[in-house]
C-alpha cells in the first residue's frame, strides 16, 4: 500500500507532495551551504580550508537551490498540485511520466553530492566554465559527476515541461479557452516552454564539455580549434531563460495571492499579465550575452544586448503595476500570505532596478563578478522566488493538508525572514560598488564591516527557516481543521474542500459559458 502510493504514484497531488518534501529537504541542504559561505566571509582570514573547498560549497549552494529547491517546489510541487485543479482536469496528461520526472531528482541530487565527495570537488561555480572545468584544472571525477547530475535534472525538467504543456493545452473543459485559465496556469505553461527550449542547449554544452574532458575532443580548447567562449554562449542561452523559469511561476502565485487577499474576483489587467509573461519568456531568450560583457564582444553587439535587456523591464513593470492596481481599492486582508506578496513586490522591484543598472554594458565592465551582481540576483531569487514560495505555501497550506497554520507565528516568521534577507543582501550592494569580487574565500580588511553585517543577517534568516519547521509541526500537531474558504467561485482549486479528495474531476466539469 505505502509503496504503491508513494513510490509508484500516478496521482498529481501525491507527486506534488513528494516534490514539496524533496524541495524542503534540499532547501535545508542549500541553506546549510549558504551558512557555510557566510561563516567563511564573516571575518577576514580563512575559516574552512582553501578557496577550492569554498568554491565547491558556493557551486553546490547554487545547484541545490536552483535545481533541487526552487524548481521542484514551484513547478513540481505547486504546479502538480494546482494546475489540474485549476483547469478541471482529473490528473496530469502523462501520470506515469510525472512520477518518473520526480524520481529522476533524488539520483541527480546524489550525483551532485557525490561530486563534492570525490577528489577536490567541483569548484567551478554553477556556470562550469572551461578551462577551469577542464581535465587539467579539475582532474578526477568531480566535474563529470556534476555534468551527469545536470543531465538527470535536465531530463526530469524536460519531461515535466512536456507534461505540463500537454495537460494545459489538452485537458481543459471544451468550453474554456486558454484565455480563461488562471494566471498561475499560464505562468507554468510559459515556464514549461522555456524549459523545453533552453535545456537541450545546456545538455549540448555540458555534453561537449564531458567529451572535452574524457574523449580528447577540443570543442572548448583553442589548441584544437575550439573556443571557450562557445561554451559561455551555450551555457547562458540556457542560463538566462533559467532565471526566468525560476521567477515566472512565482509571478503566477503572487497574482493569485494579491487578488485573493484584496477581496477581488479577478486580477487587474488579466490579458496584460498574460502578454507580459509571454513577452518576458520571449525576450529572455535574446539577451543571454549580457552575462558576457567582459569577454570582448564588439561594441555594436554590446549595444544590442544592453538595449534588449532593458526592454524586459517594460513587461516586468506591467506586472508590478498591475499587482498594485489589483490592491487598489480592495478590501485588503493582512494575512501572512499577503505580507509575503507585498514583500515580494517591493523587494523584487529593487532587484529589478539593480538589474537595469547591470544591463548597461559599460557599467557592467566595472560591476561584473563583484558582489553587486550577487546582491542583484539574490534580491530577485532569495526575496523574489523564495518569498513567492513562502507566500504560496502559507496560502495553499490549508488546501494541501486540511489544517491551518498559526497566523501569529506565520507573521512573526515573515518579519524575521524579511529582516534577515535584507540585512544579508543589502550591504552586498555596497561591497560590490567598493569592488569586492565574487568567489573568493577571503578579502581585504576594508570590506570587513559590511561582510560581518551580511553574515549576521544570514543567521537571522536561518532562525526563520527553523521557525518555519516549527510552524509546520505545530499545524500538523494541533490539527485545526479548515471550516470554510471564501471566494471559491473564482478560485476553482478550493472547490473540493480541504484537503480535496484523492481523485477530483473524474467526471468532466460542467462549465456555464458566460456571455460577455
From Swiss-Prot:
Keywords, sorted A to Z: Calcium, Copper, Electron transport, Heme, Iron, Magnesium, Membrane, Metal-binding, Mitochondrion, Mitochondrion inner membrane, Respiratory chain, Sodium, Translocase, Transmembrane, Transmembrane helix, Transport
Upper lineage: Eukaryota, Metazoa, Chordata, Craniata, Vertebrata
Reported function: Component of the cytochrome c oxidase, the last enzyme in the mitochondrial electron transport chain which drives oxidative phosphorylation. The respiratory chain contains 3 multisubunit complexes succinate dehydrogenase (complex II, CII), ubiquinol-cytochrome c oxidoreductase (cytochrome b-c1 complex, complex III, CIII) and cytochrome c oxidase (complex IV, CIV), that cooperate to transfer electrons derived from NADH and succinate to molecular oxygen, creating an electrochemical gradient over the inner membrane that drives transmembrane transport and the ATP synthase.
GO cellular component: mitochondrial inner membrane; respiratory chain complex IV
Alphabetical list of Pfam families matching this protein: COX1
Location in or out of the cell: Mitochondrion inner membrane
Binding site residues for Fe(II)-heme a: 61, 378
Any one of the GO BP annotations: mitochondrial electron transport, cytochrome c to oxygen
Gene: MT-CO1
Crosslink feature (1'-histidyl-3'-tyrosine (His-Tyr)) location: 240-244
CDD domains recorded: Cyt_c_Oxidase_I (cd01663)
Signal peptide residue numbers: none
Residues bound to Na(+): 40, 45, 441
Binding-site list for heme a3: 376
Positions that bind Cu cation: 240, 290-291
EC number: 7.1.1.9
Mitochondrial matrix side: 1-11, 87-94, 171-182, 262-269, 328-335, 401-406, 479-516
Record PANTHER family: CYTOCHROME C OXIDASE SUBUNIT 1
Membrane disposition: Multi-pass membrane protein
Subunit relationships: Component of the cytochrome c oxidase (complex IV, CIV), a multisubunit enzyme composed of 14 subunits. The complex is composed of a catalytic core of 3 subunits MT-CO1, MT-CO2 and MT-CO3, encoded in the mitochondrial DNA, and 11 supernumerary subunits COX4I, COX5A, COX5B, COX6A, COX6B, COX6C, COX7A, COX7B, COX7C, COX8 and NDUFA4, which are encoded in the nuclear genome.
Native source species: Pappogeomys bulleri
Name this protein carries in UniProt: Cytochrome c oxidase subunit 1
Pathway noted in the entry: Energy metabolism; oxidative phosphorylation
Positions that bind O2: 244
Cofactor: heme; Cu cation
Family note: Belongs to the heme-copper respiratory oxidase family.
